[in-house]
Amino acid sequence: MHWKNIMPLVNPLPKNTNSEITELAKFFNETLGFCPNSVLTMMHRPKIAKAFINLNMAVMENQGRVTSSLKRLVAYVSSNVTGCRYCQAHTIRAAERFSTEQEKLDHIWNYQTHPSFSEAERVA
């Protein structure tokens, strides 16, 4: 069977199914420019969707010493290490949207030696 013929076991819900989760999903609309199908699928279980969204909001919050850009770069590298193409696509998109310098995106795999990365970024 070709991968294109595989259907999901659970279909994503329409974006406006649950007003509370739809409100929380605005985080992804701001971060990625869209709400991922994984979140729309989680909406079948609103408590799970809410917990997932709140976790993402807490981790990626724009406060503290770690910049939003660096958080997204770390997420991208982590996604690559685990082999999750779905997460790779979302984290690199978020890094772009959070104004990560193109030089860093182009040289992410040389972060330990490339001059565009600071010592703090190398440690992260």
Task: Outline where the language-model segments fall.
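Mobile cap/lid helix-loop segments that border enzyme active or cofactor-binding sites
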Residues: 2-65
